[in-house]
Amino acid sequence: IGDATRNINGIFRLFPNHAKVVEHCEKIGFVSLPYILWKKPTTKPKYKGKGAFLGSGMLPPNAYVTLDCEFILIFRKGGPRRFTPKDPARYESRYTKQERDKWFTQIWDVIGTKQFLSEVERRAAAFPEEIPRRLMRMFSVVGDTVLDPFLGTGTTLKVAMELGRNMIGYEIDKEFKRIVERETHATK
């Protein structure tokens, strides 16, 4: 979830989308767990017509920090999940010590591959496959069901299929259907 900046009543300010989502999820019974910050390498500040650097350029005090991170919010419904000793799905889903040490840190610097997107695909909030792959391996086991309420181009669906997870996805924009079918067909 990316925060945003807005001009509200003539005053430039931060609109903390992540805080609003946390507040709402806690209100409906979810428990907040430590979040991850994904440092997006594609939103580096630039200047003089070469990008998105805004504010007063090189003059204080009206420049502002570029929002180049997104929050990966993690919630749980109820208490910790329990498994029987030696549960086969849990052992089949294990990760290595190196993966654990890399994944269970608060700041992720994940770089995606260059994408050549159609006009429809550019409207999606695209992210590298590595993001849902890590999250599914960290917080689910083989055979679990993953829910993506904003399916978009189907990245999460594709990764879930590759990892042996079941998947439910919702998307209100019908133009994405063809893209999702193409992505999932290539994965089968």
Can you annotate each of these PLM segments?
Residues I1-R178, H185:
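Core catalytic lobe of class I
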Residues K188:
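C-terminal segments of enzyme domains that contribute to small-molecule binding surfaces
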